[in-house]
Amino acid sequence: MSEPARIAINGFGRIGRSFLRALYENGYRDSVQVVLINEPAASEAIAHLLKYDSSHGRFGEKVTQSGDALTVAGDNIALTHQTEIEAIDWRAHEVDFVVDCTGVFGSQADGQLYLQQGVKRVLFSHPGKPDVDFTAIYGVNEKELTVDHKVVSNGSCTTNCIVPVIKVLDDAFGIDSGAITTIHSAMHDQQVIDAYHPDLRRTRAAGRSIIPVDTRLARGIERILPHLEGRFEAIAVRVPTTNVTAMDLSVTLNSDATIEQINQVLREQSERQLAGILDYTEEPLVSIDFNHDPHSSIVDGTQTRVSHKRLVKLLCWCDNEWGFANRLLDTAKTMAEQTEH
C-alpha cells in the first residue's frame, strides 16, 4: 500500500473541523493524512472545539494538545497560526496538497500562492472564482476531475445539495427554468445580538429573525450545468437554527410528469448512481433529523407537488456542515489518489 497523501488544512472552523472528523469517521486515514492545520485561533481552542461540538457531539477519537502540536488518534498534526498563505512554510511539513477552508481565498491567484511554495494542488472548501481550474460536485461531474486540475473548488453546501437533484430532473424530463429558495441555518457571520456588519440585515440578532441574505447559487448552477445558463434564479434566508438547511426548488419541465413519476426517478437514482450522495425519504421528518447526515441532499417525497403537469416543487434537506464535509473529503481522497506523493 502506498503512503497516504500528506495534506494541510488551512482554516479550522466549522468545515475544517468537520472535514477532519469525517476523515477519521469514514476510515480514510490510510489514504489521506493531515499533517498540518493552520488556524489563527489559540491551540487550546482548536483542540477543545475538535473534541466537543454543539451540533455533532463529542469526537470519537482521542485528541491531545501540547503547545503547537495536536495529536488525533495517535497521529501528530502541527499547528500554525498565520493569516497569509505565504507566511506558512508548507515545504517544511512536506505538504502534498492543501484543503483551504478559510472562506477567504478562492481565486487562481490564491491557488498559485500555494503552488509556488511546493504544494502540488489546492482544494477550496467554498465556491471558487470563475478562474479556478475545476469545480467538483460529486454525483454530477467528479469523473471529469483530473491531475491537471491544480486549483480546485468543491462548490458550496447548497450547490452540492441542489445540483444533483436538478441533473436528475433534467436528464429525465428536461428543465426549462427554475427558482430556488435556500432556507439556511444561521452562520458565523451573523450576530448573537444586534451589532455592526456591512450587510445591514446581518446587523440583527440571528436568533430573533428570519434574515434574507445574498446568494450566488444560480451562477454556481450555471458553472456546473452550463446548458442551463440564464434559466435559474435563487434567493436565500437564514433562520434561527444552528445546523441543517432546507432548499425549496421550483422547476418548469419540458415534458409532462406526475408526482409519482418524479418521486420514482429521484428514489431510483438515490439507490443507484447517486447512492451515498442523494437520499430519499417519505418519513414525517424535521430539520434536526438530518443533523450529521452524510448525504449531499435528501429529497422529502411527501412535499413533492406538480401544477399543470410541468410546474414542479420539491423540498430537499442537507446538513450544510456534515454533508458538505463528506463531499469535500470525497474530492480530497480523489485528488490524493491522483497526486504523486
Swiss-Prot record:
Residues annotated to bind NAD(+): R14, I15, N320
Residues noted as binding substrate in the record, renumbered to the chain: S156, C157, T158, R202, T215, R216, R238
Subcellular location: Cytoplasm
Any one GO CC term of the record: cytoplasm
Pathway where it operates: Cofactor biosynthesis; pyridoxine 5'-phosphate biosynthesis; pyridoxine 5'-phosphate from D-erythrose 4-phosphate: step 1/5
InterPro entries: E4P_DH_bac, GlycerAld/Erythrose_P_DH, GlycerAld_3-P_DH_cat, GlycerAld_3-P_DH_NAD(P)-bd, NAD(P)-bd_dom_sf
Domain of life: Bacteria
Assigned EC number: 1.2.1.72
UniProt-annotated catalytic positions: C157
One GO BP: pyridoxal phosphate biosynthetic process
Catalytic activity: D-erythrose 4-phosphate + NAD(+) + H2O = 4-phospho-D-erythronate + NADH + 2 H(+)
Pfam families with a match to the protein in the record: Gp_dh_C, Gp_dh_N
CDD domains: GAPDH_C_E4PDH, GAPDH_N_E4PDH
MF annotations from Gene Ontology: erythrose-4-phosphate dehydrogenase activity; NAD binding
Site residues, Activates thiol group during catalysis: H184
Enzyme class: oxidoreductase
Keywords of the record: Cytoplasm, NAD, Oxidoreductase, Pyridoxine biosynthesis
Record-stated family: Belongs to the glyceraldehyde-3-phosphate dehydrogenase family. Epd subfamily.
Subunit structure: Homotetramer.
NCBIfam families (alphabetical): E4PD_g-proteo, PRK13535.1
Function: Catalyzes the NAD-dependent conversion of D-erythrose 4-phosphate to 4-phosphoerythronate.
HAMAP family documented for this protein: E4P_dehydrog
Record's protein name: D-erythrose-4-phosphate dehydrogenase
Species, as recorded: Idiomarina loihiensis (strain ATCC BAA-735 / DSM 15497 / L2-TR)
Lineage, opening ranks: Bacteria, Pseudomonadati, Pseudomonadota, Gammaproteobacteria, Alteromonadales
